[in-house]
Amino acid sequence: MIPTYMNIMLAFTISLLGMLTYRSHLMASLLCLEGMMMSLFIMTTLIALNTRSPLTNIMPIILLVFAACEAAVGLALLVSISNTYGLDYIHNLNLLQC
């Protein structure tokens, strides 16, 4: 396997392990999720460059749009929780409660 792909998969795995380790804090979870999205973006960009197919050129852009939307929603939740409770614990995020 090419070392570049191995490094990107290692970055994704480390971000996934960080997400599993720091799942109680929203800020750490969002940072790990961004690391996962960036490694997926780089991987899809490299695949699109290597295949040279016009159909795969749009995939990294779509992934980047979804990553930006995810970051905006995550930061909005973080600001809302920190203003309400003063902490960024995920267990404070109980939106189903009336």
Curated annotation (Swiss-Prot):
It comes from the Eukaryota. It is a multi-pass membrane protein. Gene3D superfamilies: 1.10.287.3510. It is found in: Mitochondrion inner membrane. It catalyses: a ubiquinone + NADH + 5 H(+)(in) = a ubiquinol + NAD(+) + 4 H(+)(out). One of its GO terms (molecular function) is NADH dehydrogenase (ubiquinone) activity. Its EC number is 7.1.1.2. Keywords: Electron transport, Membrane, Mitochondrion, Mitochondrion inner membrane, NAD, Respiratory chain, Translocase, Transmembrane, Transmembrane helix, Transport, Ubiquinone. InterPro entries: NADH_UbQ_OxRdtase_chain4L/K (IPR001133), NUOK/Mnh_C1-like (IPR039428). The keyword Mitochondrion applies. GO terms for biological process: ATP synthesis coupled electron transport. The keyword Membrane applies. It is an enzyme of class 7 (translocase). One of its GO terms (cellular component) is respiratory chain complex I. Pfam families: Oxidored_q2. The chain crosses the membrane at residues 1-21, 29-49, 61-81. Core subunit of respiratory chain NADH dehydrogenase (Complex I) which is composed of 45 different subunits. Core subunit of the mitochondrial membrane respiratory chain NADH dehydrogenase (Complex I) which catalyzes electron transfer from NADH through the respiratory chain, using ubiquinone as an electron acceptor. Part of the enzyme membrane arm which is embedded in the lipid bilayer and involved in proton translocation. Belongs to the complex I subunit 4L family. This is NADH-ubiquinone oxidoreductase chain 4L. It comes from Macaca ochreata subsp. brunnescens (Muna-buton macaque).
